[in-house]
Every structure is written in C-alpha cells, then in structure tokens.
Amino acid sequence: LYADGSETVCVYEMPDHPAFLKGISWNLVQGYEQLKHTDDVDWTFVCPSKLLDPDGPRTGDYLTRTDRHIPINEDGNSYVSYDDLAIAMVDFGQNGSFKRQLVAVASRRGGPQA
C-alpha cells in the first residue's frame, strides 16, 4: 500500500515500518506484481490496515479500498481486528468480489483512539 497521496512510497519503505517486516513486505509486493500478470488463476490480494489487532472485536462491519492506499476508518484509524479481516476474506471468497484485485480492509470503527 502507498504511504501517502504521492503514490511513490510504499508503507514498508517508511522509516517507522518495523525492520523485521521490511523483507516480508517487499516479497509480498513482488508477489502482487507477479499476480497482476497471471491470467490462468483467479486471485484476490488482501491487505490489512496498518494496525492489525489480534484482540480486537469481531464486528463483521468493515470497509475496503482498491486504490492501493491505506484504509482509514470512520474513527480516523488504519485499524482492523483479526476477526474482521477473516470475515472479509471469507466474504470475498464466497461472493466472488475483488477478483484479480488488491483490496485493503479496515474495521469500520475502532483503533487506538476509538
């Protein structure tokens, strides 16, 4: 995902991105770039918000973005609970939405300031 509106810097390239995740994030970007040129499989590339909360509530209420920008929820946070991300992924698989697309997911509400 892009770090800002310039669409030139990715989140993993920012100084505050955890060092132990930079290599993983770079590899994920490379995988996405390869998928974009694959015609023989259906795929959906799901990106969580900046804060992925393992203990967050299961609301089933989430929002999505497909423009490679960080999703910001109604509380002004880039936040998604594990449960809401899992629900979104199952929904995408069951209803066939976002085929051959990157989609970023955020819980509609919640996060550190909520």
Where are each of the predicted segments found?
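Oxidoreductase cofactor-interface core, primarily capturing Rossmann-like NAD(P)-dependent enzymes
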Residues: L1-A114
